[in-house]
Amino acid sequence: MREEVLTMGKRARQAAHHMAKVGDVHKRKALEHMALNIEGAEAAIREANDKDIRAAVAKGLPAAKVDRLRLDAKVLEEMACGLKEVARLSDPVGEITRMWTRPNGLRVGRMRIPLGVIGIIYESRPNVTVDAAALCIKAGNAVILRGGSEAFHSNRCLADILRRSLVETGLPEDAVQLVGTTDREAVLDLLKLEECIDVMIPRGGEDLIRFVAENARMPVLKHYKGVCHVFVDDEADPDMAMRICMNAKVQRPGVCNAMETLLVHAGIAQRFLPPMAEAFRAAGVELRGCERTRRIVADCAQAVEEDWYAEYLDLILAIRVVNDMEEAIEHITRYGSQHTEAIVTGNFERAHRFLQEVQSSLVLVNASTRFNDGFQLGLGAEIGISTSRLHAFGPMGVEELTTTKFIALGNGQLRS
Amino acid sequence: MREEVLTMGKRARQAAHHMAKVGDVHKRKALEHMALNIEGAEAAIREANDKDIRAAVAKGLPAAKVDRLRLDAKVLEEMACGLKEVARLSDPVGEITRMWTRPNGLRVGRMRIPLGVIGIIYESRPNVTVDAAALCIKAGNAVILRGGSEAFHSNRCLADILRRSLVETGLPEDAVQLVGTTDREAVLDLLKLEECIDVMIPRGGEDLIRFVAENARMPVLKHYKGVCHVFVDDEADPDMAMRICMNAKVQRPGVCNAMETLLVHAGIAQRFLPPMAEAFRAAGVELRGCERTRRIVADCAQAVEEDWYAEYLDLILAIRVVNDMEEAIEHITRYGSQHTEAIVTGNFERAHRFLQEVQSSLVLVNASTRFNDGFQLGLGAEIGISTSRLHAFGPMGVEELTTTKFIALGNGQLRS
């Protein structure tokens, strides 16, 4: 296996050298061609997908998991649309982000270039195969994909279509490669290929991400959990605060940017919490409050220390009443995951300070935490959300799949 | 030990929360105060330094190594000047690098924030203690320093002065901490502190850097070797090319941005190489050439495969004659270290293509490779040169010790 993975790595490196020089017109054509080929291969894709589905059912996988594997007509159409959208994004490669002149006349600048070879290790959903590859290609990279065993046939079929599309548009097929086995050994081999893979992006459960982070020799862009907070200040518009909290908790509770803990200023708690709690209960949300919350909200369960750390990903909410914004920020700093926090307030000074002092990947004023997403923030697409601070912090779009090199234009400058 | 390192990590995290909120006036004052305190403590510093020097001599360290340990009046003055220069750099923290408005009216931007806690593991030179700490502080971070055993007393004395200066200017002393022992166990413990240290920067020999890269759980900003190339095109001005090559090789041969391999276009080799070789020999440079070079340059040694990979860090130069720029770029891609490459040419098209296609941390046209340095490129100061592509590629200044978070300003936006 080691040998096979090494060969893939070397091929990826070669392909990356080629891809770095490809112009945007050519990359757009390839991505649009991928979309056409996926639309044209619906029967073959669904046949491969059926194999995975049948195996998953036979293995006794829970229905929700089986469902996430399914490539029906709607998912395939979304895939093709996604490819066309990525094709239309503006090309980050070659952009000169800044340029300045030194006293000796040397003109120095920074130019955006692809990262090189990107490794993506993911579980379950086969659409990642297409979405992730598209973004890597757009940014001029080569990609090595290693999907989960449950989606093996689907991933294989999709990767073959992407590779064929590259060849048909005159690009190197090895710009997209899928690891041919699903055993864990292959993952370990990949994680040691620091000379061939410039960055590894794990996508999946916390176990997978920790495994990758602990074993990778190359840099890892990773996303642990999202314990997101909304702080309702005493100068908040209560109606706006209720709408934002409801949206942040209920609109899609199973995702990383959903609110998990609500912090309420003591000055508004008496007014705000009773109707808010009623609305949450009507929406089926289980509430777990601090002592002060329980004095205001009848029949609220007692929150224990673990609740403040919890990423429920479910219709459960922890609630705490705090004396002021300082206490709210302290709570966020202590228990939060640096993912997404929002303040609802009409007070300029506090909005300003919350924005400055809360060090999460997205900090919002008067808007729902659910906006922490590449599409929603205007990046066009995303390959994940980084909660570590190096290179990228927050949603990663096509630009985060590039880096910058320095360039210098001289007329004979020497160092003295 | 594990316990002591963990305590340092937690203190650093606390200090980092504080430092992130400190305004630039305050940070400047602290850095200028450090400079004053170093100037005022010359006797104590030299006393501590003498202990290290005596131990190094007793241990039989080579004279060059002993010399690098020495903190004489000149080095101390440079340290103080460095502190004042860093104090005057513009503060990157809080800068909003971009802002845009989404169709729903949400205003989204990116704001520069400190990285948090930075770990620096270094060898030998005690001035790193001061230079590195200053840059970390300026960028609003806390830093944990782990210096080499040879400079133990010097580092301890300097770190104490920095910590005292922080306290005297009302900042948390734990923004600068020095690991109190020099055993390797402590390094391993540090490398596992991913929850407390956001990034690790190793500075020293290749062994140290590999050890850190292989064992760190947090991201690492690292610098392997610099196998730097100059390509002399057939449309180069021969005099300019000679001056640039001489500067790149001879001005300071022992550093990472010195030229190690010279690539010469076949169309200019007959004219260019004989006087160039003569000039190199006059400067004491040993030449190792390819077959074609040896046909032009008398008494040139034969370069073998390893020479193309070599970082000599000495007055030795590998020379290869290539048919065209494509062959030069292929050579650089195959044997280079992505550090620094220069082209000397009067041809616009080739200059343009070389700039685009060579993927090194600094690519120059008509200037010496020796400019790959934070001061020379105008970053004000540097904490090292990164040859890996994530987060930073090339010299790292104060801005590279920050990251950006997303901010969003709304008036009640919800996700639908």
Curated annotation (Swiss-Prot), chains A, B:
SUPFAM superfamilies: ALDH-like. Keywords: Amino-acid biosynthesis, Cytoplasm, NADP, Oxidoreductase, Proline biosynthesis. The keyword Glycoprotein does not apply. InterPro entries: Ald_DH/histidinol_DH (IPR016161), Ald_DH_C (IPR016163), Ald_DH_N (IPR016162), Aldehyde_DH_dom (IPR015590), G-glutamylP_reductase_CS (IPR020593), Glu-5-SA_DH (IPR012134), GPR_dom (IPR000965). It comes from the Bacteria. PROSITE patterns: PROA. It is found in: Cytoplasm. The keyword S-adenosyl-L-methionine does not apply. Its EC number is 1.2.1.41. Pathway: Amino-acid biosynthesis; L-proline biosynthesis; L-glutamate 5-semialdehyde from L-glutamate: step 2/2. It catalyses: L-glutamate 5-semialdehyde + phosphate + NADP(+) = L-glutamyl 5-phosphate + NADPH + H(+). GO terms for molecular function: glutamate-5-semialdehyde dehydrogenase activity; NADP binding. Pfam families: Aldedh (PF00171). Transmembrane segments: none annotated. It is an enzyme of class 1 (oxidoreductase). Belongs to the gamma-glutamyl phosphate reductase family. Catalyzes the NADPH-dependent reduction of L-glutamate 5-phosphate into L-glutamate 5-semialdehyde and phosphate. The product spontaneously undergoes cyclization to form 1-pyrroline-5-carboxylate. This is Gamma-glutamyl phosphate reductase. It comes from Syntrophobacter fumaroxidans (strain DSM 10017 / MPOB). The gene is proA.
